Amino acid sequence: MSFLLIVRRTHLYLGLFLLPWVIMFGVSSIPLNHQGGEGGAQWTPIKDGPFTAEPPASADPAALRALGAQMMKAADIDGGFWVYRVNAQRVDAGHPNFLRPVRATYYVDQKRLLVERRSVTLEGFLTGMHTRGGYNLGGFWDTVWAVSVDLVSVALLAWIASGLFMWWELPGTGLRRWGWLALAAGAVSFALIIAKL
């Protein structure tokens, strides 16, 4: 089997592997680019009660993460979560579920924890898939998602490289000229937009 045939098959099967991911990123880009609010998404309280955990005195991320874990436990929420200190009197934490994310707000001065769940919306579902990432959420499936995104990123780069190699191996110069034109048009338009923004 020739090297070119290996590259072609790699390109083909990487394309098939990437298909659901590329479709997801393509479709989820539409609501990100055409934002019109949350399209009727509502946050519904599911728990509202006392909470007396002491917030960390310092800006130590580990201490804040520990408080977030207590908030999630009090909210009866399993899985990965994020946590953010809004100010001295408020700490937010949340579980970024694709369909029905949950957020918990700790009002420190009131010793109160408000837990809310967002209603299901197509816009929220799609943008959640597009923007979710990172290994810092801590849940098993959150880590699986992060690893998958890394694998897809590497596969996309390999797919691009194999496509460039196949283009370069085209016989004659006529077809290669069209490739140079496409590369130049893409690079110039991208650079121009980046420079102007």
Model regions: which residues?
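Internal alpha-helical transmembrane segments
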Residues: 1-42, 143-197
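Charge-dense, low-complexity intrinsically disordered segments
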Residues: 4, 58, 116
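Membrane-proximal low-complexity regions enriched in glycine and acidic/polar residues
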Residues: 37-101
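A structural signal for alpha-helix termini and helix-coil/disorder junctions
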Residues: 73-77, 128, 132-135, 157, ...
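Extended, hydrophilic extramembrane loops/domains of integral membrane proteins
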Residues: 96-153
